[in-house]
Amino acid sequence: DPRSLWLAAAALLSARPTLAPGPQLLTRARALVQLPAHTVAPPSHTVAPPSHPRPLADRTAHGGLLFVVPLLRHLGIDAFLAAHPALADAELPLHILHDIATRCGAPPDDPLRLALGAPSLDLPHTPIHDERLLAAAGPIRLRDTPPALALFRAALRRHVRRGARIGLRTLVVRPARVWSSRTHLDLGFAMDLVDLGIRRIGADLHPGHVPWLGRMIHFHHGHQHF
């Protein structure tokens, strides 16, 4: 629909500020959402409903799992994946999300986990020498866990504890409604679940287009979405 096309164009401009508005931008935006050509409508100033919703939204008790996405960006996962193509091919971010979901008690049939989909490859035990990630994770014992998974998990725990004064489980375990499609993933939270500590670390801010998950991700707060 026009709103999805506009969001895709905005995501492309955010990712590539040098890309000029024009026919080329619209072509790339249409390719992103695979929509037929039509006029782009300007965004509404009212609160818009989640994009591409199912007729009935599913409910999850672990809606905060996707709050991990902005934090992974903060930890530099985009550059990390570019420097470690084997881990990118094995869908490291999906491994991280499902590992955290399991540790926080989300069952395999949780609607959000099903919407994300499972990684298709096992994660290789690639040695990690990324100084930024090693510093963020602090000293840890790797044991039998793939190093990249263990390091990002430790770095996330440390960042959430220091910045929001909560544990990773407290971040993740929060009820939400889930709308999903092949290109979009929207979560709706009750307004009274807004947490200043979580906002302070930017975990509940819209991720927008997330290339390593292949989705446009948006968070909605308010009882009309929950």
Feature map (PLM): residue ranges:
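Short, compositionally biased pre-sequence/patch detector
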Residues: 1-226
